[in-house]
Each structure stands twice: as structure tokens, then as C-alpha cells.
């Protein structure tokens, strides 16, 4: 019954299965392999931080809000509905590095307040300005990587890109 081991041997992103509907970003966290991922989380191996960058973006949560699940009014992460179908185009190494670097800036902004939990970091009424700035920079990189021709200012613009990318990927 408990014979299946899924703990990765590298750093991984712990992805909470549920986040509050008030969240502007998915509250994921990078953990070392020595930290056991509990059953209230999903995980994706992420030795370089690229996956963290994507899941921490407005592009991801826009897709999650639209095609992901819910429990009551909160968002429910699904690897099959939202993660495995997230339509990321082929990325060159320079683009990947920019997303990784921008994701690291999000982590750096969180580290400025080590006493705060993830819930406290992302309280919409108390999110630190430096964390907002870091997420804005990450959004610019992810949006550009996903094909945005200009700065995106709405969820609708992000959804248009997501659905266009998805349609392109399923056509082959």
C-alpha cells in the first residue's frame, strides 16, 4: 500500500493542491529533496527553477482559474487539467535563463521577510511591494516566452495567448 516512493532526488516545486480564490499568484515553493512533500501538495522536479518560474506567473494562474478545478470557491490544482496541458512553446536557453532568474528574484523578495509564511507573503492586503515588483518582472518574462507581443495588462490577454498556444500545440 505504501510502497510507492515519489520523492525526487533533486530540488522540487511543492505545489499546494488548493489555494485561496483571493490569490493573485499560485503559492508554490522550492524544496530540497530532504524535505518530504506531503499529500496536500503536488510536486514537480525542478533542479534549475524553470518550473517554479512558470507556476509562479500570472500566466499560469490565469489558466488555472479558467480550466482548473475548484473546491468551494478556492482553486484546486490538477496535474492533468492545468499543469500537463499548460501550453509552453519551445524555449531557447536564453529565454529559460531569464525566467529562472526572474523566478529567483521572487524567492529573493520572499527571503527579505523570512518570518512570513507563504500565506502571509501572498495576503492581498499585505503583499510586500518588492514581491509585487519581482512577480511583475517574472510575468514580463513568462508572457514574452509564451508569445506576448507587448506587455499584458489583463487576464483575458493571457487567456487568448494560452488558448492560441494550446490550439497550435494540439494541431502539431
Residue ranges of predicted features:
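Polybasic, glycine- and aromatic-enriched phosphate-binding surface used to engage nucleic acids
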Residues: 1-101, 105, 167-172
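Non-catalytic DNA-recognition/assembly elements of restriction-modification systems
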Residues: 85-172
Amino acid at each position: 500500500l505504501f510502497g510507492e516512493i515519489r520523492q525526487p532526488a533533486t530540488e522540487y516545486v511543492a505545489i499546494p493542491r488548493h489555494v485561496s480564490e483571493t490569490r493573485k499568484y499560485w503559492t508554490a515553493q522550492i524544496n530540497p529533496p530532504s524535505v518530504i512533500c506531503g499529500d496536500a501538495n503536488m510536486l514537480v522536479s525542478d533542479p534549475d527553477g524553470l518550473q517554479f518560474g512558470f507556476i509562479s506567473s500570472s500566466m499560469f494562474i490565469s489558466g488555472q482559474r479558467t480550466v482548473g478545478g475548484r473546491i468551494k470557491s478556492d482553486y484546486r490544482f490538477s496535474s492533468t487539467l492545468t499543469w500537463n496541458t499548460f501550453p509552453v512553446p519551445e524555449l531557447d536557453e536564453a529565454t529559460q535563463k531569464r525566467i529562472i532568474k526572474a523566478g529567483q528574484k521572487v524567492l529573493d523578495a520572499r527571503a527579505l521577510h523570512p518570518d512570513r509564511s507563504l500565506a502571509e507573503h501572498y495576503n492581498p492586503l499585505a503583499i510586500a511591494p518588492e514581491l509585487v515588483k519581482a512577480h511583475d518582472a517574472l510575468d514580463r518574462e513568462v508572457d514574452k516566452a509564451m508569445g506576448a507581443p507587448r506587455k499584458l495588462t489583463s487576464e483575458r490577454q493571457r487567456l487568448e495567448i494560452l488558448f492560441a498556444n494550446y490550439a497550435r500545440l494540439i494541431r502539431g
